């Protein structure tokens, strides 16, 4: 169901990532309160990929995205004559969680995650002791985002080497709260989702540390921001239609959204804000209406978010 914040003459349609949704929802509510409810914004959740389909077809003004835009999506937008402004808004860490009654999993290597989630593991890896022999011979039940989710794309590329490359026999949903409820109710479960959903549900889930070669690291504000939780930390984005950018309500709302003054709100939601200078670069990019992708497409640029933004202002 879409989320409607306020009433007015114009409508701004926002769709996309379930991971970014809580940020956008909170920004819409805060901004709506600050202007006395004189604008109308409707938010849906179609997943990052599903949102880009609507966005590039002209059916959404803003797309929430938990990954950068793909080359095929850039092409689809171009075919429909749509330009866009790409704005990183926060940092997230993909969090692996298990049922709180699981007393044997404390840390997983990337290779063990691959063993669980590889396409060739479908129908084959079904017990915990198949992942690590010292673990009990108990059923392994996997939960994850749907294939239209940017979280699914990012996780599969990081763990399996190719986006969308995954076993298919897992319980999937575009709504992270469905995954949380499933894991919380199943002792043999494991799943992944954005860091904020763990923070919100840490009383009913158990977080697993990840060893990417330098020891076991839990996702925290500090490890996500300083890079020690890499490669499972990532920037989150909103994409704004250049046509919609010309509308004053959109300019005002997005300027409010990306300002460093919202850093406290991001922390309250379980996300990690960028340093102030990065938020300033993002705001400048939006206010100048700089179009195109510098983080995605055929040739994504390398470096930190700040380095990439600074080189393209």
Predicted feature residues:
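Flexible loop/hinge segments at secondary-structure junctions
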Residues: 7-313
């Amino acid at each position: 169901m879409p989320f409607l914040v306020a009433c007015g003459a114009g409508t701004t349609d926002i769709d996309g990532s379930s991971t970014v949704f809580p940020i956008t929802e909170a920004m819409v509510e805060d901004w709506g309160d600050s202007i006395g409810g004189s604008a109308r914004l409707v938010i849906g959740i179609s997943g990052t990929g599903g949102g880009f389909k609507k966005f590039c077809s002209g059916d959404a003004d803003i797309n929430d995205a938990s990954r950068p835009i793909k080359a095929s999506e850039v092409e689809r937008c171009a075919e429909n004559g749509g330009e866009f402004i790409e704005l990183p808004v926060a940092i997230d860490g993909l969090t692996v969680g298990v049922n709180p009654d699981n007393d044997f999993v404390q840390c997983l290597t990337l290779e063990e995650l691959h063993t669980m989630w590889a396409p060739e593991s479908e129908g084959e890896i079904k017990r915990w002791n198949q992942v690590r022999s010292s673990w009990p011979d108990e059923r392994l039940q996997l939960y994850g985002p749907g294939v239209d989710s940017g979280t699914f794309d990012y996780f599969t590329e990081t763990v399996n080497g190719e986006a969308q490359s995954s076993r298919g026999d897992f319980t999937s949903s575009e709504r992270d709260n469905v995954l949380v409820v499933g894991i919380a109710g199943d002792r043999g479960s494991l799943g992944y989702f954005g860091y904020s959903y763990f923070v919100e549900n840490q009383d009913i889930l158990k977080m697993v540390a990840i060893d990417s070669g330098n020891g076991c690291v839990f996702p925290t504000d500090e490890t996500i921001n300083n890079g020690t939780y890499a490669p499972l930390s990532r920037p989150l984005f909103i994409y704004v239609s250049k046509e919609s950018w010309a509308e004053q309500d959109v300019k005002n709302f997005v300027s409010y959204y990306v300002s460093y003054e919202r850093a406290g709100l991001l922390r309250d939601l379980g996300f990690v804000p960028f340093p102030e200078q990065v938020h300033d670069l993002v705001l400048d990019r939006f206010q100048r209406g700089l179009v195109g992708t510098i983080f995605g497409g055929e040739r994504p640029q390398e470096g930190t978010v700040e380095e990439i933004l600074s080189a393209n202002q």
